[in-house]
A protein has these predicted regions:
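Aromatic-rich beta-strand edge motifs centered on tyrosine
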Residues: 1-21, 32-42, 53-63, 75-85, ...
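Tandem-repeat architecture and repeat-register "anchor" residues
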Residues: 25-26, 46-47, 67, 90
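Sterically constrained small-residue positions within well-ordered secondary structures
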Residues: 5-7, 26-28, 69
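A generic structural motif
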Residues: 29, 50, 71, 93-94
Length: 105
């Protein structure tokens, strides 16, 4: 069933699942974040009230396999091998007045 508690300062409400994984936080200022985990307890998704999203996928060993990050200013994707070396990456930057910049390696 999980549980809820306030942080040590009383400014943020934290909600946990049955495995003690943080699944939701809400600050007094209104900022919120939601978290998801895979079967092994790895944090695989984060979304917040500012529009930031971050996805992650892990190897069975627990090492990071890929990640995707997106907010209003940039977006990137990376893939890694089992040793943590970057295999593929793509970064997009969204400047306000310029055209979109894409960097792939």
């Amino acid at each position: 069933m999980g549980y809820k508690e306030y942080d040590e300062y009383g400014t943020r409400l934290l909600e946990y699942d049955d495995n003690n994984n943080l699944i939701h936080s809400k600050e007094k200022c209104g900022f919120e974040a939601w978290y998801e985990y895979d079967d092994r307890g790895n944090q695989i998704y984060i979304k917040d009230s500012d529009g930031v999203e971050h996805w992650r996928e892990f190897y069975n060993s627990g090492k990071l396999k890929s990640e995707h990050y997106k907010d209003s200013k940039e977006e990137y994707w990376y893939e890694y091998d089992e040793n943590g070396k970057t295999l593929k990456g793509k970064f997009m930057y969204f400047p306000k007045k310029l055209h979109q910049a894409i960097i792939t390696y």
